[in-house]
């Protein structure tokens, strides 16, 4: 057993539904076997009374959204949480609240992806054009759509990327269909991808790719089809069987995602936001073979990730070891160590594939100043050309204070009314 873990304390706050779905008590038991004390936090009490805490794991997405709606109880919970973080910059937070707010806003997360792709300059990546609609469609809507590179058919999603309603989407095929769009929302070009979605589940330096069913191909351009309304969660369930996912035939390119591309995208998001627990939805354009990021999720469900608890514990051990050895200073973003590709083929699960990243594996991301650093756009959580830590704990170095990090993220993060 790694002796440096003994006596460490990990606090967590998850909804009861999330705890049951993940069977998080099993993770707590796994931690205890390694000498780590696990504490379920009660945000209705001062966190100070429940500390000290070396690590906090949370999914406060519901609470943050309620606070943004001026719910007094949620505002108090978020304030109490932030107050503890500000008072204890040594505590590792998985994941920072400003980053979570960015991922809760599809418009902002899509803009971040656009900047990351422009920085990476990788022809294998080309996510669809998007645009935010803040008012009902009017006479100039078509002009705005065209100016932003959008063309029929396109997919319409809620701006908020969390909650039951966030899965309610529509495919619009013509101008008449615009009348049913309810702002605020984000519209995104629909890319044919042979009805296959790849869900990338990231835990620190590890990630697992799981194949899921997705929407079938549709003809490009305007058509007289009526808009299709659907729930993306239902469509992309592992066992989903729907007329929307029934592919008549495979068209054009049918390729697997590149492990290298996924590794660099994951690493770039970790660098830009300082997140450790997130999911990326990727499709492969059946005309070009390019990877397209169509959504990013904070602390997803990790369905199909059999080693989630092991990966999470290893990540916690890694960041705690870095903290205790003094190597967790600014400037280090370790390349992703391995991935597991659990693609569900017609005959069942494909064999697990592991990739160990060498120091040069992500060379295209090294030695360049990314556009999301403060000097470039005030959109990231770094300073100058300094790369941020994979776990990006708030105030993890003397040179980066919590208030400065929050300021740096402000142009991309959704600001809650509690702040």
UniProtKB/Swiss-Prot annotation:
PROSITE patterns: ATP_GRASP
Keywords from the named record: Acetylation, ATP-binding, Hydrolase, Isomerase, Kinase, Magnesium, Metal-binding, Nucleotide-binding, Phosphoprotein, Transferase
Matches recorded under InterPro entries: ATP-grasp, Inositol_tetrakis-P_1-kinase, InsP(3)kin_ATP-grasp, ITPK1_N
Cofactor names: Mg(2+)
EC category: transferase
EC number(s) reported in the record: 2.7.1.134, 2.7.1.159
Binding site for Mg(2+) 1: 281, 295
List of residues binding 1D-myo-inositol 1,3,4-trisphosphate: 18, 167, 199, 297
GO BP terms, alphabetized: inositol trisphosphate metabolic process; necroptotic process
Domain of life: Eukaryota
Binding site for ATP: 106, 157, 188-199, 214, 232, 236
Residues where Phosphoserine is found: 401
PTM-bearing positions, type N6-acetyllysine: 388, 415
PTM (free text): Acetylation by EP300 and CREBBP destabilizes ITPK1, and down-regulates enzymatic activity. Deacetylated by SIRT1.
Ranges of residues in domain ATP-grasp: 117-325
MF terms in GO: ATP binding; hydrolase activity; inositol-1,3,4,5-tetrakisphosphate 6-kinase activity; inositol-1,3,4-trisphosphate 5-kinase activity; inositol-1,3,4-trisphosphate 6-kinase activity; inositol-3,4,5,6-tetrakisphosphate 1-kinase activity; inositol-3,4,6-trisphosphate 1-kinase activity; isomerase activity
Residues holding Mg(2+) 2: 295, 297
Reactions this protein catalyses: 1D-myo-inositol 3,4,5,6-tetrakisphosphate + ATP = 1D-myo-inositol 1,3,4,5,6-pentakisphosphate + ADP + H(+); 1D-myo-inositol 1,3,4-trisphosphate + ATP = 1D-myo-inositol 1,3,4,5-tetrakisphosphate + ADP + H(+); 1D-myo-inositol 1,3,4-trisphosphate + ATP = 1D-myo-inositol 1,3,4,6-tetrakisphosphate + ADP + H(+); 1D-myo-inositol 3,4,6-trisphosphate + ATP = 1D-myo-inositol 1,3,4,6-tetrakisphosphate + ADP + H(+)
Free-text comment on the cofactor: Binds 2 magnesium ions per subunit.
Quaternary state and interactors: Monomer. Interacts with GPS1/COPS1.
Entry's family note: Belongs to the ITPK1 family.
Described purpose of this protein according to its UniProt entry: Kinase that can phosphorylate various inositol polyphosphate such as Ins(3,4,5,6)P4 or Ins(1,3,4)P3. Phosphorylates Ins(3,4,5,6)P4 at position 1 to form Ins(1,3,4,5,6)P5. This reaction is thought to have regulatory importance, since Ins(3,4,5,6)P4 is an inhibitor of plasma membrane Ca(2+)-activated Cl(-) channels, while Ins(1,3,4,5,6)P5 is not. Also phosphorylates Ins(1,3,4)P3 on O-5 and O-6 to form Ins(1,3,4,6)P4, an essential molecule in the hexakisphosphate (InsP6) pathway.
Protein name, UniProt field: Inositol-tetrakisphosphate 1-kinase
Gene encoding the protein: ITPK1
């Amino acid at each position: 057993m790694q002796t440096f873990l003994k006596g460490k304390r990990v606090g967590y706050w998850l909804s009861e539904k999330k705890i049951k779905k993940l069977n998080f008590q099993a993770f707590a038991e796994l931690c205890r076997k390694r000498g780590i004390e696990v504490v379920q936090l009660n945000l209705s009490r001062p966190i100070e009374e429940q500390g000290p805490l070396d690590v906090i794991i949370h999914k406060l997405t519901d609470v943050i959204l309620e606070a943004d709606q001026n719910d007094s109880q949620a505002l108090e919970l978020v304030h109490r949480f932030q107050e503890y973080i500000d008072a204890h910059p040594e505590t590792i937070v998985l994941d920072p609240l400003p980053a979570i707010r960015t991922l809760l806003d599809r418009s902002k997360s899509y803009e971040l992806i656009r900047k990351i792709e422009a920085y990476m300059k990788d022809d294998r990546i080309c996510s669809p054009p998007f645009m935010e609609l803040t008012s009902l469609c009017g006479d100039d809507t078509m002009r705005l759509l065209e100016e932003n590179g959008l063309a029929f058919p396109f997919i319409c999603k809620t701006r908020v990327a969390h909650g039951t309603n966030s899965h309610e989407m529509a495919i619009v095929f013509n101008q008449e269909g615009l009348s049913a769009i309810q702002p605020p929302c984000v519209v995104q070009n629909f890319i044919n991808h042979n009805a296959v979605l790849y869900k990338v589940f990231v835990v620190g330096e590890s990630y697992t790719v799981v194949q899921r069913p997705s929407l079938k191909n549709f003809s490009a351009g305007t058509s007289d089809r009526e808009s299709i309304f659907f729930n993306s969660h239902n469509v992309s369930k592992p066992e989903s069987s729907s007329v929307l996912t029934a592919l008549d035939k495979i068209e054009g390119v049918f390729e697997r995602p590149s492990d290298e591309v996924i590794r660099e995208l994951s690493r770039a998001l970790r660098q830009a936001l300082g997140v450790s627990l997130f999911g990326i939805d990727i499709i492969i354009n059946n005309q070009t073979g390019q990877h397209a990021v169509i959504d990013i999720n904070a602390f997803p469900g990790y369905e199909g990730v059999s080693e989630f608890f092991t990966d999470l514990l290893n990540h916690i051990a890694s960041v705690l070891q870095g903290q205790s050895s003094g190597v967790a200073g600014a400037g280090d973003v370790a390349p992703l160590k391995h991935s597991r590709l659990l693609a569900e083929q017609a005959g069942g699960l494909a064999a697990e594939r592991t990739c160990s990243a060498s120091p040069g594996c992500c060379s295209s991301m090294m030695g360049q100043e990314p556009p999301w650093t403060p000097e470039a756009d005030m959109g990231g959580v770094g300073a100058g050309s300094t790369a941020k830590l994979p776990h990006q704990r708030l105030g993890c170095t003397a040179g980066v204070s919590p208030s400065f990090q929050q300021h740096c993220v402000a142009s991309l993060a959704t600001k809650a009314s509690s702040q």
